[in-house]
Amino acid sequence: MADFFNLKARQQAAAQASSSKTPTSKQESNRLQPWVEKYRPKTLSEVTAQDNTIQILSRTLQSSNLPHMLFYGPPGTGKTSTILALAKQLYGPELMKSRVLELNASDERGISIVRQKVKDFARQQLSVAPTYNVMTEDKDGGEAKMVRYRDKYSCPPFKIIVLDEADSMTQDAQSALRRTMETYSRMTRFCLVCNYVTRIIDPLASRCSKFRFKSLDQGNAVRRVDDIAKLEDVKLDAGVSEELVRVADGDLRKAITFLQSAARLVGATQTAGRKKKVVVDDEDEMDIDPPSAPSKTTISLEQIAEIAGVIPAPTLASFSDALFPKSAAKSIRYNEIAKVVENMIAEGWSASQTVSQLYEQVMFDERVEDIKKVRLAGVFSETDKRLVDGGDEHLAVLDLGVRVAGVLCMG
């Protein structure tokens, strides 16, 4: 009871209680962080395979004269990473929070967001740049030295609003955004990020400088995957990096996610049984894995195929064989097709993955004549649209099989 009035004794008791808990260390936090975020480019020079775009933006970075921008291209090519890296080099860590607003337009796509959140941020006065000194490194590898914040980061007199997946915005929201861009262009710059530039209305696109992000070539993507695997001390079998890029269809973000999933799968057997208790609060505890030791097991091609949901070659071959006529009568073997499709759906294979792999299997088969390939292209495109529209997967794949078999049986 006497210790209750002793402030020093109470502080010591609180310190001992907090030290008895096992906090999540910085190393633990980094281990649990998605590799996509962990290895996101911090500067423009770290962005891969977009040389022309990076060259133009680097010139803009030096002059601090930024136009409204429109980044478009396939997913996983570095569009969002590029604008965030540019903003970090312009403002530094202190001004990023107050000068940059990032919105995912696929979640907040209505006109109310443009009228409220975007407009409110655009009309805000600029925050003052810090006056203290920061540490900087010599580009030639010399010793670090202290410089003013404004000398390291240019801190131009405008804010940046990043609208990710802007092609998901409604027409009304895009029209409202056009007026907002005109009104607050003196102190705000907009960067629209999208996959399909045709879904951006012309009045909005004409106000922006367009930057096309091309799909990463095989060499750059494989090199980046190998670098991350080396940094994470993950061992890969021969050809695994190339397979990761192939199953990801050039999407580097997806390839890195597959790599992390495979690394966790390989290390699961090693970390099992070595879990430790972490005190979350005064009563609750949580089991977490300790930082895993360097993996002695390598990631194989079979594990990548399993994680990516790639249909095994024997399963796909049985489906394609059922589509080709066996006899001279050239009749559709419906029962065989229906049985194979039923088994594939029961095993849980994705219908979209089935369509994608079957397309490559059939369209690149030398036994199929060119005139038939023209008709098959229409069949595959119709099935793909039905799946996108939410059609039943079993019926869509069965219909695809029957229609493809019908084209192949034609004389």
Swiss-Prot record:
Protein name in the entry: Replication factor C subunit 2
Places the protein is found: Nucleus
Subunit architecture: Heteropentamer of subunits RFC1, RFC2, RFC3, RFC4 and RFC5 that forms a complex with PCNA in the presence of ATP.
Keywords noted in UniProt: ATP-binding, DNA replication, Nucleotide-binding, Nucleus
Family: Belongs to the activator 1 small subunits family.
Composition-biased stretches (Low complexity): 11-27
GO biological process, one term: DNA repair
Role according to the record: The elongation of primed DNA templates by DNA polymerase delta and epsilon requires the action of the accessory proteins proliferating cell nuclear antigen (PCNA) and activator 1. Subunit 2 binds ATP and single-stranded DNA.
An annotated Gene Ontology molecular function: DNA binding
Annotated GO CC locations: DNA replication factor C complex; Elg1 RFC-like complex; nucleus
Listed SUPFAM superfamilies: P-loop containing nucleoside triphosphate hydrolases, post-AAA+ oligomerization domain-like
Chief location: nucleus
InterPro entries the UniProt entry points to: AAA+_ATPase, ATPase_AAA_core, DNA_pol3_clamp-load_cplx_C, DNA_Rep/Repair_Clamp_Loader, P-loop_NTPase, Rep_factorC_C, RFC_lid
Matching SMART domains: AAA
